[in-house]
Amino acid sequence: MFTKYKFLYFLFDSTFFKYWYVIPMAMKIYIEGFDEKGYGVGNNIHVPFAYPGDIVEVKVRRKGKKKIGEIVKIIEESPYRTSNKYCAHLGKCGGCLWGLMDYQYQLEFKKKVIENLFGYDKDIIPSPKTIYYRNRMDYPIYNKVSLKEPGKWYGYIPIKECKMLSKEAEIIINEFNKFIEKYKIPSWDTVKHTGFLRYLVIREGKFTKERMIHIITYKRKKFEELWDFIENIKDLVTSVYWGIREDLGDVSISEKLYHYYGSKFLRERILDIEYYISPNSFFQTNSYQAVNLVKIVKEFLEPSENDVVLDLYSGVGLFSLQIANEVKKVIGIEIVEEAVEMAKLNASINNIDAEFIASPVEKAPIIKANKIIVDPPRAGLTNKAIEYIEKINPDTIVYVSCNPYTQKRDINKLKGYKIIDMQPLDMFPNTPHIENVILMKKSRTTD
């Protein structure tokens, strides 16, 4: 039977689809600048892995109203390019979109983004490490461990190395590829919605040298073969989980978890605080730069013994636990119940008095607080979340964001506050993403 899923697969996989969306003639274009995603732009064509000053020959396809270019040949290289090609997959997988650009120029372009958005001339704090800096990678499985092509949710690049995580992770990736081949385990097909293996998630404690493996699959009663893989990597890991996700969405979070090996949690240490992290919990992905992030948040917040602080989108308590001993009270609000449980555990193991509430920010209780830390996801604050903050009416807001575009949008909506200072950081080297911390104070009526 020719179901709608088979039709979609035919559409995506067929020559018809490729030529219907691809302009058949290659075009030569000059790259003038970047778009918000970090793609090079020239002649209104958006080109991954192209940088200002490049002259490139591209094949063009349409994605909605946008024209996307795929580099066929670099005719003249941008002066911003680097000769340090540190990974075999550079220019193919979407993990390091700016990986072919010199790091100092990456910082300069990120600085320009902040300056154009906010009018602040602030140097970006560089990442202490530019490779092997991430503490988590979520690798989709498509026959082999893979990463995705930029802008293509259905396009996979099989990998044998990844310079974002660690050398040990590269060994694990290759062992998992051998494991897949040995047992002929089918991978999940995001179009047909068939198969089994979905994601290999590797998490690391950069300061504790611990490592957690979280293998996410479609539903199945048993996964006995997994013990064979564990036997081959057990000297490299401290924890292994098998997780099941029955939902058809392409998300690397498990609905059911089975603990197979080692510790139940991954530990990470930021400054003097130890954090326990569960498989589905969020944690800042660059532990080295998280140290600087925490210091900036504390500097902007200026915690004192009379302060009551609300930490919105508090996760496992990264900021709350760092300031708890310096304020009268800190309350974290977090929608993910698993993260709230971890935050409570982290408070306990560090002998810290802090309160955590499982709730969407929009539905959280109104708490009298004079200071707020807010660190929302990339999508930023909803209108209801902004209304909640305005009801609290704090004197000080410290807004931490991994997306300065939505941060700018939200600040424009917040009534009665003005920007006092900001500090951008490079949490994500070799990508166009920017972390930005903004200090806001309540405006006086005479201002």
Swiss-Prot record:
The active site is at 402 (nucleophile). One of its GO terms (molecular function) is 4 iron, 4 sulfur cluster binding. One of its GO terms (biological process) is RNA processing. SUPFAM superfamilies: S-adenosyl-L-methionine-dependent methyltransferases. CDD domains: AdoMet_MTases. Its EC number is 2.1.1.-. [4Fe-4S] cluster binds at residues 87, 93, 96, 162. Gene3D superfamilies: 2.40.50.1070, Nucleic acid-binding proteins (2.40.50.140), Vaccinia Virus protein VP39 (3.40.50.150). S-adenosyl-L-methionine binds at residues 284, 313, 334, 375. InterPro entries: MeTrfase_TrmA_AS (IPR030390), NA-bd_OB-fold (IPR012340), SAM-dependent_MTases_sf (IPR029063), U5_MeTrfase_fam (IPR010280). Keywords: 4Fe-4S, Iron, Iron-sulfur, Metal-binding, Methyltransferase, S-adenosyl-L-methionine, Transferase. Belongs to the class I-like SAM-binding methyltransferase superfamily. RNA M5U methyltransferase family. PANTHER family: RNA M5U METHYLTRANSFERASE, TRNA (URACIL(54)-C(5))-METHYLTRANSFERASE. NCBIfam families: rumA. This is Uncharacterized RNA methyltransferase NEQ053.
